[in-house]
Design a protein with these regions (language model features):
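Basic, nucleic-acid-binding surfaces and adjacent catalytic neighborhoods in DNA/RNA-processing proteins
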Residues: 1-108
Length: 108
């Protein structure tokens, strides 16, 4: 199972949607086409922790009407870390629009 699919699986991560998926994978520097089983244990722990943390941040930012200010990769053109152009494709079984940096996000 790809990490981009696992994050959108509501039985695994209830409430996580496409924006959170893109932002969490960028925060932990994991390529969306990485298989969950290929993640090192440390990255798997980061995935779970960041999905939870970002979900709470997301809700607070949404309530304050400042959500878009906090997007680092979702609907952006350049990576905020390296300045390279972000990749955009419809990935996973759900074919959801996915943004990522091919330089900063590692495929395991």
């Amino acid at each position: 199972v790809l990490v981009c699919d696992a994050l959108l699986d509501q039985e695994v991560f209830a409430g996580v949607g496409n924006i959170i998926k893109n932002e969490v994978l960028f925060r932990i520097r994991v390529h969306p086409c990485t298989r969950v089983g290929d993640l090192p244990p440390r990255k798997l722990a980061q995935l779970v922790a960041q999905a939870r943390a970002y979900s709470f941040d997301f809700l607070e930012w949404k309530r304050q009407f400042v959500l878009r200010r906090h997007w680092q990769v979702h609907r952006r053109r350049e990576c905020p870390e390296c300045g390279r152009r972000l990749e955009l494709a419809h990935l996973g079984t759900r074919q959801r629009r996915t943004f990522w940096c091919g330089h900063c996000q590692v495929r395991y």
